[in-house]
Amino acid sequence: TTERYVAYVDNLARQGYIVLRSDYRGHGFSEGQASGGYGSPAYTIDVLNAVAAIKAYPDADPNRIGMWGHSMGGHITLRSMVVTNDIKAGVIWGGVVASYPDLMYNWRRPDAGPTNTPDPTNPRRRWRDELVETYGSPEDNPQFWASISPNAYVSEISGPVQLHHGTNDTSVPFEFSQLLFNEMHAAGQPVEIFLWEGDDHNITTYFT
């Protein structure tokens, strides 16, 4: 939640870190159209621009930039660490860090509401249908789906990654983090995983 993010940022700042918390385009006070983080590179571009801004900040050490991402932000963090070597370490909480076939077939985050079912009219959910219509399904065109999945490039991740996930997360399966841990470990990449027993998507029991 926004309130918790403020607390996290405050704590990091008190520890001496320079912290920049981004609002993706179309979110918060940012301009532009919200496009979602899975069917478009837009949010990743926004974050990479933020990294470039931090590198230019006089008091920042450009060789010690880390990134923390929660939920969709975990997906963006993973993507960003594949794209650039500027991010030296990543921490991901409750991250949407599975391959695209898993996101297509093994993840349906319910919308809030009385029916608790996905809303097909939600523009942030249309990415599945639009990509399949344009490029075919993962079975029909596995090369395309691998090409847009950061999981296919774990050997190129720019630094160590620490994964955190509550085992009672009803928004993003904790198995996604387990799979990424296994992929990175198999690739010889430095990675840690912490599974918080019985905790939720925000890991509110252990981090309050």
What are these model-derived regions, one by one?
Residues 42, 101-153, 159:
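Mobile cap/lid helix-loop segments that gate and shape the active-site cleft of serine hydrolases
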Residues 60-71:
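Alpha/beta-hydrolase fold nucleophile elbow
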Residues 2-21:
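Short amphipathic alpha-helix adjacent to the substrate-entry channel of hydrolases
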Residues 178-208:
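C-terminal catalytic histidine-bearing segment of alpha/beta-hydrolase fold enzymes
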Residues 74-85:
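Short glycine-enriched nucleophile-adjacent loop
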Residues 170-176:
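Conserved alpha/beta-hydrolase "acid-adjacent" motif
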Residues 157, 163-165, 169:
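Short beta-strand/loop motif that positions the catalytic acidic residue
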Residues 38-58:
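Alpha/beta-hydrolase active-site loop
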